[in-house]
Amino acid sequence: MRNPNEIVAEALAAIHGCPDLPSLEQIKAGYLGKSGQLTELLKSLGAMPADARKTAGARINEAKQAVEAALKIRREALQQAELDRQLAAETLDVTLPGRGLGTAGVHPVSRTLARIEALFHSIGFDVATGPEIETDFYNFTALNIPEDHPARAMHDTFYLRQNNAGGGELLRTHTSPVQIRHMQTHEPPLRIIAPGRVYRCDSDVTHTPMFHQIEGLWVDESVSFADLKGVLADFMRNFFERDDLAVRFRPSFFPFTEPSAEMDIGCVMCGGSGCRVCSHTGWLEVLGCGMVHPNVFRHVGVDAERFIGFAFGLGVERLAMLRYGVDDLRLFFENDLRFLKQFN
């Protein structure tokens, strides 16, 4: 049997001269592995006389411990050397100034929404909200929209679930359902605006599948169409900050109002002289409005003989486009910082 001390001396010399961790693992296998030199010595103990086996076994175990201790010390030294090398290669000057954080800004749609809410709040309107997933009753039936109305078609409305009666759940196509819910839980008189996201199956330069809308409602015993015209004309002139802004109302039709009207303003791009934005008419359509239909009041239990009211609805993105001179609605939703930074 080979002398364990000779093997230890040989192993220590190899360990101390080892240049890297992979080589160190090879040295370990050569002395302590399944076929390592010290392991083979242990295997040979079975052939030795019993009286010599105990002494030889103790010497071999001492040799293993010496090699293992040397391996541990050398491994730690090599690991530290590797860490020092990496740190030196990745030196960071902590005195250098850090990267500046970009300045956040309010999105133009959020900015427009807040401006509209503030203007209506200044004349006594409260903000009401409601669910974006609505039922057929609140989105259509309670608003006097007949079953054969085009708005109920699949190509215009996102239906989530339909029942056998033709109703069901859907993504609201306007915020008018908020008015219905509010009238069910609040007694007149009331003045509210209902801002929020609405959804329609439409996408082009001036339409997106999701957009923001604000609908307003004023219900009292003596509200008139003159009140409607005064409120909306005053709002538009304040919104665009133009006291001389021209406005006009054209007859129209909506199932939930009677009479109904479309409101136009003088083109804010060309001052009414005619341009591409207003199709050279000098006018821009901005909202729909009208006196609340008696059937809507009956659906929510409001006395249609005693109370009267007006309602209106406008697109927030539409007004933002006009206020900021944006010609493509989709730009508001592309999150392009080059575009958004212009409004900060």
Curated annotation (Swiss-Prot):
Catalyzed chemical reaction(s): tRNA(Phe) + L-phenylalanine + ATP = L-phenylalanyl-tRNA(Phe) + AMP + diphosphate + H(+)
Cofactor: Mg(2+)
Molecular function in Gene Ontology: ATP binding; magnesium ion binding; phenylalanine-tRNA ligase activity; tRNA binding
EC class of the enzyme, as a word: ligase
GO cellular component: cytoplasm
One Gene Ontology term from the biological process aspect of the record: phenylalanyl-tRNA aminoacylation
Full protein name: Phenylalanine--tRNA ligase alpha subunit
InterPro entries associated with the record: aa-tRNA-synth_II, aa-tRNA-synth_II/BPL/LPL, Phe-tRNA-synth_IIc_asu, Phe-tRNA_ligase_II_N, Phe_tRNA_ligase_alpha1_bac, Phenylalanyl-tRNA_Synthase, tRNA-bd_arm
Complex and partners: Tetramer of two alpha and two beta subunits.
Subcellular location: Cytoplasm
HAMAP family: Phe_tRNA_synth_alpha1
Keywords: Aminoacyl-tRNA synthetase, ATP-binding, Cytoplasm, Ligase, Magnesium, Metal-binding, Nucleotide-binding, Protein biosynthesis
Transmembrane segments: none
SUPFAM superfamilies for this protein: Class II aaRS and biotin synthetases (SSF55681), tRNA-binding arm (SSF46589)
PROSITE patterns with a match to the protein in the record: AA_TRNA_LIGASE_II
EC number: 6.1.1.20
Binding site residues for Mg(2+): 258
UniProt similarity note: Belongs to the class-II aminoacyl-tRNA synthetase family. Phe-tRNA synthetase alpha subunit type 1 subfamily.
